[in-house]
């Protein structure tokens, strides 16, 4: 497959090499990055028209070239910061004209010179010397005219020319750092779990399958972090967390990407009430440190993380919307509601708990704007959660919703190996009936539980959705550095 290189730029590379000039040198000595130059100049507070910092060496990518006879201006940028270069023929001699022959937009150059302010007050570098560091073979596109899909497929250019994309990534990794720091401060340790696993589990989802040639066995990319993190708890680690990629072979839409980043943590001797309190403290702390406020704007909503967050059971929240006590409704009444809203429960199983879950997703979820804990789910919704201590038929589970999105899921974890074995077998029966998302039977995990797992609270938070909220982005693709895009789009010419 031929690359769509600019023939003129390729010829420049060939000509430079014929003249003994390497257009892709190994190294360049930079004394100051552009962002550092700006900080130092600002701290001095003196907008001198005479040079005030000498022998500066910096580098950047060429954004604009404005030639004016014997004196010209060039803009370069690096890490989102721009610097104006002032180039004069009396300083550069024969290299002055060569610059405009060999250097173009998108090229990376190194420059040396003295810093000053122009008569218009713009910080500039009087260039004494320059060096081409990387000749771009493709002309930078007009990014404003490109489709979102093309931007996602060519993120390296998106990051260069789209300040919003770059800023979203900076905020993303600040959020992840602050999550880690918060959990370290609470005594959690960061651990790792296998990405490729012989049995997938910890969620209800379709996996990606691969083949291990040496073992001649089919294995799976993990769909969650849960079951191996619980093995740490069984092994005597009382507070553990992992931030890692998980993979679910399912839909791609504005809130779903098959590869996404998940935080999961497990806390021995805690329950879902403790996890609720921890989740509230975690999100409040992270949002405040990243934004310097506990309030953010997401679309038309102002979302407040100050707390306390609302807490309401799934049954009560659905009853409020319907204007009728859900617990008093018959199964036939629930089926009629399912038909009314054209809903099908998981695995096409019209059992009471799964119908209530589906009706909740349809009717209640879109109404949840500020952080809200929805608690006490039907037992049919998960095989990994401990039954409710006071409410038969329910489990001690909560999910947290913000701006109509689920962002967290938590349990008082099931630690009874006999019940776990039974629930796994029931999931297998659902799989045989056609539920492709049913949880597989994990014999080794049941064996691990049989050695004894202490009472434990567990939490999962979708990192990408938290970043969506903080950066005010409605598409998950905007906050994932390299979202999943069709290879046809990736290989499409500029």
UniProtKB/Swiss-Prot annotation:
Keywords for the protein's UniProt record, in alphabetical order: Aminoacyl-tRNA synthetase, ATP-binding, Cytoplasm, Ligase, Magnesium, Metal-binding, Nucleotide-binding, Protein biosynthesis
Leading EC class: ligase
GO cellular component: cytoplasm
Species classification: Archaea, Thermoproteota, Thermoprotei, Sulfolobales, Sulfolobaceae
Biological process according to GO: lysyl-tRNA aminoacylation
Subcellular location: Cytoplasm
Signal peptide: none
UniProt-annotated binding residues for Mg(2+) 1: 399, 406
Protein name, entry field: Lysine--tRNA ligase
Gene3D superfamilies named in the record: Bira Bifunctional Protein, Domain 2, Nucleic acid-binding proteins
Record-stated family: Belongs to the class-II aminoacyl-tRNA synthetase family.
EC number assigned by the record: 6.1.1.6
Pfam families in alphabetical order: tRNA-synt_2, tRNA_anti-codon
Keyword rRNA processing in annotation: no
Entry-linked PROSITE patterns: AA_TRNA_LIGASE_II
Highest taxon, organism lineage: Archaea
Catalytic activity: tRNA(Lys) + L-lysine + ATP = L-lysyl-tRNA(Lys) + AMP + diphosphate
Record's cofactor remark: Binds 3 Mg(2+) ions per subunit.
Disulphide bridges: none
Names of the cofactor(s): Mg(2+)
Binding site for Mg(2+) 2: 406
Source organism of this protein record: Saccharolobus solfataricus (strain ATCC 35092 / DSM 1617 / JCM 11322 / P2) (Sulfolobus solfataricus)
InterPro entries: Aa-tRNA-synt_II, aa-tRNA-synth_II, aa-tRNA-synth_II/BPL/LPL, Lys-tRNA-ligase_II, Lys-tRNA-ligase_II_N, Lys-tRNA-synth_II_C, NA-bd_OB-fold, NA-bd_OB_tRNA
GO molecular function, one term: lysine-tRNA ligase activity
Classification via NCBIfam families: lysS_bact, PRK00484.1
HAMAP family: Lys_tRNA_synth_class2 (MF_00252)
């Amino acid at each position: 497959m031929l690359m769509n290189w600019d023939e003129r730029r390729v010829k420049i590379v060939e000509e430079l090499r014929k003249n003994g000039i390497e257009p892709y040198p190994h190294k360049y000595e930079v004394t100051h990055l552009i962002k550092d130059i700006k900080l130092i100049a600002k701290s001095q507070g003196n907008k001198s028209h005479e040079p005030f910092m000498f022998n500066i060496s910096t580098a950047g990518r060429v954004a604009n070239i404005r030639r004016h006879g014997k004196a010209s201006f060039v803009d370069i940028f690096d890490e989102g910061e721009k610097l104006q270069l002032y180039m004069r023929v009396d300083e550069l001699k024969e290299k002055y004209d060569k610059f405009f022959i060999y250097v173009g937009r998108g090229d990376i150059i190194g420059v040396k010179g003295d810093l000053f302010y122009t008569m218009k007050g713009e910080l500039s570098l009087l260039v004494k010397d320059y060096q081409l560091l990387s000749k771009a073979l493709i002309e930078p596109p007009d990014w404003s005219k490109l489709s979102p899909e093309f931007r996602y497929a060519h993120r390296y250019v998106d990051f260069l020319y789209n300040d919003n994309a770059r800023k979203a990534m900076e905020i993303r990794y600040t959020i992840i750092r602050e999550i880690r720091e918060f959990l370290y401060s609470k005594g959690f340790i960061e651990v790792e779990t296998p990405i490729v696993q012989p049995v997938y589990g910890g969620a209800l989802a379709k996996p990606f399958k691969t083949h291990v040639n040496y073992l001649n066995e089919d294995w799976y990319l993990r769909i969650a972090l849960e079951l191996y993190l619980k093995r740490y708890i069984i092994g005597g680690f009382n507070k553990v967390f992992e931030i890692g990629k998980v993979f679910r072979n399912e839909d791609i839409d504005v809130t779903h990407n098959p590869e996404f980043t998940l935080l999961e943590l497990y806390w021995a001797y805690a329950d879902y009430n403790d996890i609720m309190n921890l989740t509230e403290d975690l999100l409040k702390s992270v949002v405040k440190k990243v934004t310097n406020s506990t309030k953010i704007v997401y679309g038309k909503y102002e979302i407040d993380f100050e707390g306390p967050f609302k807490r309401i059971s799934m049954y009560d929240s659905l009853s409020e919307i319907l204007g009728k006590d859900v617990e008093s409704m018959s199964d036939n009444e629930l089926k009629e509601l399912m038909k009314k809203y054209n809903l099908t429960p998981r695995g096409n199983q019209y059992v009471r708990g799964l119908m209530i879950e589906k009706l909740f997703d349809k009717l209640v979820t879109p109404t949840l704007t500020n952080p809200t804990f929805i608690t006490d789910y039907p037992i049919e919704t998960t095989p990994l959660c401990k039954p409710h201590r006071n409410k038969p038929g329910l489990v001690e589970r909560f999910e947290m919703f913000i701006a109509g999105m689920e962002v967290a899921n938590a349990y008082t974890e099931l630690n009874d190996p006999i019940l776990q074995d039974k629930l796994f077998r029931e999931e297998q029966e659902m799989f045989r009936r056609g539920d492709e998302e049913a949880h597989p039977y994990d014999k080794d995990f049941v064996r691990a539980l049989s050695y004894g797992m202490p009472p434990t609270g567990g939490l999962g938070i979708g990192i990408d959705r938290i970043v969506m909220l903080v950066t005010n982005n409605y598409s998950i693709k905007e906050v994932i550095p390299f979202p999943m895009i069709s290879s046809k789009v990736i290989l499409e010419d500029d």
